[in-house]
Structures are given as C-alpha cells and as structure tokens.
Regions:
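Short capping segments at the starts of secondary-structure elements
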Residues: 1-7
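Gly/Thr-rich phosphate-binding beta-strand-loop-beta motif of the actin/hexokinase/Hsp70
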Residues: 45-82, 182-199
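Residues within the alpha-helical elements of helix-turn-helix
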Residues: 11
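Glycine-rich phosphate-binding loop and adjoining helix at the ATP-binding site
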Residues: 82-181
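Conserved phosphate-binding catalytic cores of ATP/NTP-utilizing and phosphoryl-transfer enzymes
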Residues: 34-56, 163-184
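Short beta-strand(s) of the beta-wing in winged-helix/HTH DNA-binding folds
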Residues: 4, 33-34, 39, 131
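Basic amphipathic alpha-helical segments that dock to polyanions
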Residues: 8, 19-32
C-alpha cells in the first residue's frame, strides 16, 4: 500500500531527515516509486510512495504428468504473464532440457542481464512428497517417482530454485490477508491438500 514520508516517520519513530535520506536512496534505486498524492486526515496533501512492483519478479512452474505451467509475478503478487503447455513428464535429462527451453522462451522479454538482476528465483510445484533441503521427490504417484533427485531441474536456472508440493504451493499462493485460517484441497489426477493457521 502507498504511504507518505510523514507516516513512515511516525510508524518507525525516525527523524524526517533520516526518512528523507532513505526515501531518496530507494527512489534512485527504483525500489520505490511515487504513486500519487497522500491525504491523511487533517493534513495537507503529500506525495505518496510505494513499492515499485516491477523492481523484481518471481517465476512459478507447475509440473504435472502431462502439462507444464509457467507464471511470472511482480512484487505485488500480480500476474504479469502466464502460459500452460502440453508436456509429458519423463524422468530423464531430455525433460530438463525441454523445461529450460520453454522457460527461456517464456522469459524472452528479459535479456540475460535483466533476468540475473530482476528475477529473484523460481518456485517449482510438483505433485508428491517433496524434501526441499535434499531437492528430492520422496514419492509421487502422479509422476510415478520415488526417491527421485530434482537437482537436474535446479541446474536449468541461474537463480535460486525452490521445490514444493503442489497443494502446499497453491495454498501459499492464496491471499492470507483474506484467509487467516484455510484448508486447500487439490483435486486433479490425485487428491492433495494444504492448510494454513493464523495467516
């Protein structure tokens, strides 16, 4: 949400010179932008500032038995681009090469330098029990995998890659400002679910 320098000073208990100096620095770096005018009760209008949504992006990839889904979101969790293509999962390097090729085409509006600078990371959701630390699919009925290393997929990207169970990833994608306590059910080729307590 947008705010003002005065509000930042009050909320963080900082002096105005400190706030002005930091805001100037963030504006110059493009991390924040001026978003219009801010009119708090009983005060004159001031320039409002907020996060620059296009300062950084994150990419999401959904792997299923027969499809590959891709999405790009900005810092406001707004979908900038999305695509779903038919791609049958196979457990060898040819699949990794295809995923890398499709991802490169999906991000073709960014050059290599922009991708390294602006892309924070890639989240990959997979149906099954995932060990994120070991980059391992412990078991997946949908993909017919067991104790399967995901390192080959991680190597397809030059940014951090995070793996998650598909239902858990879908739960995290929901707006937790609206749903403080929620259960997510995934009804696809297999039944899955995730839950969130207290936001």
């Amino acid at each position: 949400e947008s705010t003002s320098k005065v509000e930042i000073s009050k909320e963080l208990n900082l002096s105005m010179p400190t706030v002005l100096s930091n805001v100037k620095d963030l504006l110059e770096k493009g991390i924040i932008i001026e978003t219009g005018e801010y009119e708090p009760t009983g005060a004159r209008k001031a320039k409002s500032i907020g996060i620059n949504p296009s300062y950084r992006y994150a990419m999401g990839i959904v792997i299923t038995a027969n499809h590959l889904g891709m999405v790009l979101v900005n810092l406001k969790y707004e979908i900038v681009k999305s695509e779903r293509i038919r791609l049958k999962f196979v457990s060898d390097m040819s699949y990794c090469s295809q995923v890398a090729d499709f991802a490169a085409k999906f991000l073709d509006h960014m050059n290599d330098a922009e991708q390294k600078e602006k892309l924070l990371g890639v989240g990959i959701s997979i149906p099954g029990i995932i060990n994120q630390e070991q980059k391992l699919v412990i078991k997946s009925h949908a993909l017919k995998l067991e104790n399967y290393s995901l390192s080959f997929l991680e190597q397809a990207f030059s940014v951090p890659v995070y793996f998650s169970n598909d239902a858990n990833a879908a739960m995290m994608a929901e707006d937790m400002n609206i749903y403080q306590n929620a259960i997510y059910l995934s009804l696809n080729q297999t039944l899955g679910g995730g839950f969130c307590l207290g936001g």
